[in-house]
Design a protein with these regions (language model features):
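Conserved CoA-thioester-binding segment of acyl-CoA-metabolizing enzymes
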Residues: 1-59, 97
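C-terminal alpha-helix plus adjacent terminal tail
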Residues: 1-17, 63-65, 172, 176-177, ...
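Short, charged helix-to-loop "capping" segments that act as catalytic/coupling loops
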Residues: 15-16, 25-28, 59-69, 125-138, ...
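Crotonase-fold acyl-CoA enzyme core
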Residues: 97-212
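Glycine- (often His-adjacent) and acidic-residue-rich active-site loop
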Residues: 52, 60-95, 114, 145
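Hydrophobic/aromatic residues within transmembrane alpha-helices
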Residues: 22, 58, 71, 121-123, ...
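Charged catalytic carboxylate motif
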Residues: 35-39, 91, 98, 198, ...
């Protein structure tokens, strides 16, 4: 988006009292800007406080994009000035940590690019399922001289091991659904024709179970597996400090000159173009 226009960028479809679908809808690129974060904050609060809710699925209404990178045309201070959330973290990492800790099951249905923030949302969800043909996950930040801000340095090593986490982060490559499954980046990948039906059936099944059993089982798995908040906070601080570096700004300018931030080949094949910036 080119401004802070307050159109609805996230829609909640309450399929039943126990099962919600949250639809990301910020065309044409599903960028994450300050207004998106503000709207997401409200949804996270609703998820935390609804006593009947047991499972929520995140999906996209925008063809080609699950959730994309940040809106670099928005003012950075509009994002950083959003007050810290209940966890004490800044707004975006606070949303992700609260989602992971919420007493409901969160599922990412990934079709299209999950770039940067989209990858971070998928990692914060309890489960994620990728379209084999259409899903692309990417932590692209190192390729432009940045550090990712939503916690992938803390989450990825716990999912796939140190070496593979460093490969994903330091290569800034596009990771397709089948490789994402092999690495443990997502739970599973499916042929696109089977993707929706599987996720809906799983969510419906979980939504039929008792919330007490769901929330307590998740709480105990969280205690055994999640990074401490201090690791998430350190990543956010490094990200914000990296954005204004002259070397980062120079690489970002090259990317913008080639068509970044507009519908087209650069956004569709970001991993390829990021890999050419140092040439």
């Amino acid at each position: 988006m080119n401004s802070t226009a307050k159109t609805e960028q996230l829609h909640v479809n309450r399929k039943s009292p126990s099962y919600w679908r949250v639809i990301i809808d910020n065309p044409p690129l599903n960028l994450m800007g300050p207004e998106f974060v503000l709207q997401f904050q409200k949804i996270i609060t609703d998820i935390e406080n609804d006593e009947k809710l047991r499972v929520v699925v995140f999906e996209s209404a925008v063809d080609g994009f699950f959730l994309n990178h940040s809106d670099f045309l928005a003012k950075l201070e509009d994002l950083t000035s959003i007050p810290q959330g209940p966890t004490g973290l800044e707004a975006w990492p606070d949303i992700l940590v609260r989602l992971t800790q919420a007493p409901v099951v969160s599922i990412a249905l990934i079709r299209g690019r999950a770039t940067g923030n989209g990858s971070e949302l998928a990692l914060a969800c309890d489960m994620s399922f990728a379209s084999r043909e259409k899903a692309i996950l990417s932590q692209w930040e190192v390729g432009v001289g940045m550090v990712a801000g939503g916690g992938p340095m803390a989450r990825l090593p716990r999912l796939m091991g140190r070496g593979r986490a460093l490969e994903v982060l330091l290569s800034s490559e596009d990771i397709r659904g089948d490789l994402a499954e092999l690495y443990g980046y997502v739970n599973r990948s499916f042929p696109d024709s089977d993707h929706d039906a599987f996720v809906d059936a799983l969510a419906t099944r979980i939504g039929s179970f008792e919330k007490w059993a769901i929330s307590n089982t998740k709480r105990l798995v969280n205690a055994a597996s999640l990074p401490p908040d201090v690791e998430i906070a350190a990543g956010w601080d490094a990200c914000i400090n990296s954005i204004t570096r002259p070397a980062t700004q120079a690489r970002m300018k090259k990317l913008f000159d080639q068509g970044f931030h507009k519908p087209g080949d650069v956004e569709n094949r970001l991993g390829f173009y990021v890999g050419k910036l140092g040439s």
